[in-house]
Regions:
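Walker A (P-loop) ATP-phosphate-binding motif of ABC ATPase nucleotide-binding domains
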Residues: 4
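Hydrophobic anchor at the beta1->P-loop junction of P-loop NTPases
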Residues: 7
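ATP-binding Walker
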Residues: 12-13
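Walker A/P-loop
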Residues: 16
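NTP-dependent small-molecule kinase module
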Residues: 23, 162-224
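ATP-dependent small-molecule kinase phosphotransfer cores
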Residues: 29-140, 144-145
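A glycine- and Lys/Arg-enriched "phosphate-lid" helix/loop adjacent to the NTP-binding pocket
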Residues: 115-190
């Protein structure tokens, strides 16, 4: 059974880029590696999340033929307990892919996993005691009830919101409803930092001396 390594991160922190670079480095060392990413937008559960919940512009136009997601309050404002089930269902639906990857590779890299649910849903709760309870509920839901494998390592890429705004200006991809919600993003960022301390994640700071680090510089630290 291979090792499960999860890469989490704040908005625009480069989760996809870093996991793809890790795949390249592992393959050069003849290490069998598989990369997965959640939500899996090309699956039925992923399409529900991308189009109906988050209102991703390209998916909405192709699937729903409307101007936004199904939820009038916006993807970042949906009741936390209701929202966790969408993301948890996507991982449970794709559990066979995770198990197959672990059984046939030395390392499985996942871009966003259960921690993402904990941060983005828990971050919506201002009361710390209730927020910690939410973390526990999500762990129970995903790891115990849905039987997802627990990660061997979680790497957290930390890019503060104000620096993410700089990178967003150069992006061609249109933001979804959650990505346009500043309060949602900032609360998620704070929750990620709290989770990193509570669960002892490996934190990689994407900013040094008030400058965003280069992709390769960050990857060297992630790989080490």
């Amino acid at each position: 059974m291979g090792k499960l390594i999860v890469v989490e991160g704040t908005d625009c922190s480069g989760k996809e880029t870093q996991t793809r670079l890790l795949v390249d480095r592992f393959e050069k060392e003849n290490i069998k590696v598989k990369r997965l990413s959640f939500p899996m937008y090309d699956t039925p559960t992923g399409k529900i999340i991308g189009a109906c919940l988050l209102g991703k512009p390209d998916m909405v136009n192709n699937l729903l033929k409307t101007d936004g997601g199904f939820f009038p309050e916006g993807g970042g404002n949906i009741d936390a307990l209701a929202a966790i089930d969408f993301y948890a269902a996507d991982r449970r639906y794709n559990l066979p892919k995770i198990i197959d990857a672990l059984e046939n590779n030395d390392i499985v890299l996942i871009d966003r996993y259960v921690t993402s649910n904990m941060a983005h849903r828990g971050g919506l709760i201002d009361n710390k005691e209730e927020r910690l309870k939410m973390y526990e509920k999500i762990e129970l839901k995903e790891y115990v009830i849905n039987e997802l494998p627990r990660p061997d390592m979680i790497i957290f890429l930390y890019l503060p919101y104000e620096y993410a705004c700089i990178l967003k200006k150069s992006r061609k991809e249109l933001p979804d409803e959650a990505e346009q919600n500043i309060s949602y993003l900032k609360k998620g960022e704070n929750a990620y930092l709290e989770l990193s301390e509570l669960y002892n994640y490996d934190i990689v700071n994407c900013v040094k001396d008030n400058e965003i680090r280069t992709i390769n510089d960050i990857n060297d630290e992630v790989y080490s």
